[in-house]
Amino acid sequence: MTSQPVLNAEQIMGLLPHRYPFALVDRVLEHVPGEKAVAIKNVTLNEPQFQGHFPDRPLMPGVLIVEAMAQVGGLIVTQMPDLPKGLFVFAGIDGVRFRRPVVPGDQLRISCELLSLKRQRFGKVKAEATVEGQLVCSGELMFSLVD
């Protein structure tokens, strides 16, 4: 059971540029701009990637788990006070590990925490994704502001 969202789908769309089928954050449970965010991604069988990954045994692709974590991280960096406005893009990953498969019906709980910000252009977050309290993916994600 999850708590009430602090940001709903409409509010998330106002903060992130992603749209269907690439909007991977369904609701935000905690959000402290410039510090941390906790969000939910509900994994459903009707998502387009499951048509081919894999038809007889659908698994959420690891790159989409990482992208979901990056979108939650983006909520931290893009909403920081006193930063120049612009588009923050995913710039790199370090130490990403996958611990178990994610399947339709799972609910990803994604937690991100800001580790560093350099020259008001480059951010790094620590990210973890869990399903029912079990770690499924973790790593550090980097962001860069593009003009």
Curated annotation (Swiss-Prot):
Keywords: Cytoplasm, Lipid A biosynthesis, Lipid biosynthesis, Lipid metabolism, Lyase. It holds the Pfam family FabA. This is 3-hydroxyacyl-[acyl-carrier-protein] dehydratase FabZ. It is an enzyme of class 4 (lyase). GO terms for molecular function: (3R)-hydroxyacyl-[acyl-carrier-protein] dehydratase activity. CDD domains: FabZ. One of its GO terms (biological process) is lipid A biosynthetic process. The keyword ATP-binding does not apply. It comes from Synechococcus sp. (strain WH7803).
